[in-house]
Amino acid sequence: HGTVVSGTHEAHELDWPEFHNGVASALEIGAANVDSSWIFAHASASRGGRARHAGFLLGLGLHGHLRRLGRVHAYRYLAPRHVLTTVGLVLGLGASFLGTGDAAARQVMAVQVAAFLPPGSVPLHMSTMTQAAGLLGMGLVFCQTDHAWTAMRLASQLDAPMVDTADANEAHRDAYAHSAGLALGLVYLGRARRTSMSSSADHTLLERLCRAVATPLGEASGMAVARTAAASALALALLCLRSGRRDVAEALAPPTPANLAHIRPDLLLVRSLARALVLGDASPSDEWLDSTCAWTHPGDDVPRALAFYQIRAGACLALGLLYAGRADERARALLLRQLSLE
């Protein structure tokens, strides 16, 4: 009716939506032949434009186009230390150089993460989100390479008490720890299925991750323990992907109703997801879905209801991942039925 509605949002609230718009735009390009100068020519100076171009870089990386990005242009993107641009570039490079162990790409990742700098280096005080992207980018570059040194450094960041960062120490720490867990899992992707994991180093790593997942919240700072537990579960999910390791699955199993007070409900989602990915035996049936939780719908018992839905949500996500690309009608129908679960 001619009324002008003015926006009440802050400018920064649109940064991530613009970032995702940029990713979508780049994905439309497909296999087009692009070069370094063409990519850099699309950069923008406006706030929304910078966020959108950051996502554009990630989208190009998903297509592998950032292999053609010159080193000079890469460092021109990194020099202003704009967080979203760095995140988009680092993850895009990681996707473009997936599993190659490329030395130049690794150098870009390592510069973003204080934990990967040589001893005695001048602290760069990167933001926590930038360092989280660097960790995940490192995992992508060394995906399924079993590169032991990189894996060791990533494992050390799962429970790092302090991070040399420009932010308040707790800002985005969950993203940092989860990125370390995912990156560690990527470096050793499917290792438990590909090898016997019989070395002492492998045993030590598995025991460490399983112990972190199972640590009760009362034994240390609740937030730090929960953060490490979730990151360790993600690492186990990828490291033992479809391996059928029952010992690892047992460590990830949901607690009994009597022990629900010792674990946050959201951690149950991650553990349920990881357990299903480790076993790899998901089937699109109500029987399988019911088997993922030790009790049936708890009615009005709120703590048990929260746990029940989180465990079920993790199982549904795992089913979607394991059946991705199959166009399985039974899996689709089962997941749609969960939307009306009461």
Predicted region positions:
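Mature, well-folded catalytic/scaffold domains that follow N-terminal targeting or propeptide regions
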Residues: 1-342
